[in-house]
């Protein structure tokens, strides 16, 4: 009986190692975008239906449309756009910032981010969980890392358009923009006022700008 008790955890661990990652047992797991996405990502396409185009994404050479309220555009090459990264723990995106452009405070719940500036000047930073801010003005060629789940931002700090590329440690890093979470939905004004100490008039103004109600 003691021997059987010892064998069971060993077998269980062995089973977990075999089943924990498609990448551990096959070369790749191209996402089957026709299937639903689960907590572990998309299921794999059958190898016979995989094409070279599944491993190629051509959208990062095209400037995004910055004619919007934040004067910024993000072109993602996440698993939904680039099925070849499924299961590999990587993805990338292009960031265009017009003069005065800003990516408001946001988080990526599923991944850390590395930002490299390709053109212009970008003021970027994040706030640690102890509320310490870390800010830096980045020039062409500079790189900054944003740890997973922490609030961070990017602002065009120059007098010309800025361009950057961001890589992520997940095929689907997720995104939540703080301003949108507060003011671009039907979260009641009184609740926001109680939890942020903003006055109702300011909240309604921000809801009006961002398309929220209540």
Curated annotation (Swiss-Prot):
Residues that coordinate or bind Mn(2+): 106, 108, 113, 152
Main location: secreted
Signal peptide interval: 1-23
Database matches in Pfam families: Cupin_1 (PF00190)
Molecular functions (GO terms): manganese ion binding
Domain Cupin type-1: 58-204
Compartment(s): Secreted, Extracellular space, Apoplast; Secreted, Cell wall
Glycosylation sites recorded in the entry for this protein: 65
Disulfide bonds, paired cysteine numbers: 29-44
Gene3D superfamilies per UniProt: Jelly Rolls
One of the protein's GO biological processes: auxin-activated signaling pathway
Record keywords, A-Z: Apoplast, Auxin signaling pathway, Cell wall, Disulfide bond, Glycoprotein, Manganese, Metal-binding, Receptor, Secreted, Signal
GO cellular component labels: apoplast
Purpose of the protein: Probable receptor for the plant growth-promoting hormone auxin.
Subunit structure, as described in the record: Interacts with ABP19.
Record-stated family: Belongs to the germin family.
The protein's name: Auxin-binding protein ABP20
Species of origin: Prunus persica
């Amino acid at each position: 009986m003691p021997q059987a008790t010892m064998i069971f955890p060993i077998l269980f661990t062995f089973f977990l190692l075999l089943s924990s990652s498609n990448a551990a047992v096959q070369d790749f797991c191209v996402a089957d975008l026709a299937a639903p996405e689960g907590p572990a990502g998309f299921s794999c396409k059958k190898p016979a239906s995989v094409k070279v185009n599944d491993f190629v994404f051509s959208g990062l050479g095209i400037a995004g449309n910055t004619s919007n309220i934040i004067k910024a555009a993000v072109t993602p090459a996440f698993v939904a756009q680039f099925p070849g990264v499924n299961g590999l723990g990587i993805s990338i995106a292009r960031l265009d910032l017009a003069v005065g452009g800003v990516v408001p405070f946001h988080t990526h719940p599923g991944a850390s981010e590395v930002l490299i500036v390709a053109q212009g000047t970008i003021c970027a930073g994040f706030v640690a969980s102890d509320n310490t801010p870390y800010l830096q003005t980045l020039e062409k060629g500079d790189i900054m890392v944003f740890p997973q789940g922490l609030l961070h931002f990017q602002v065009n700090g120059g007098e010309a358009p800025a361009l950057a590329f961001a890589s992520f440690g997940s095929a689907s890093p997720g995104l939540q923009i703080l301003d949108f979470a507060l003011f671009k939905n039907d979260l009641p004004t009184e609740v926001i006022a109680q939890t942020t100490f903003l006055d109702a008039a300011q909240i309604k103004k921000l809801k009006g700008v961002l398309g929220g109600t209540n």
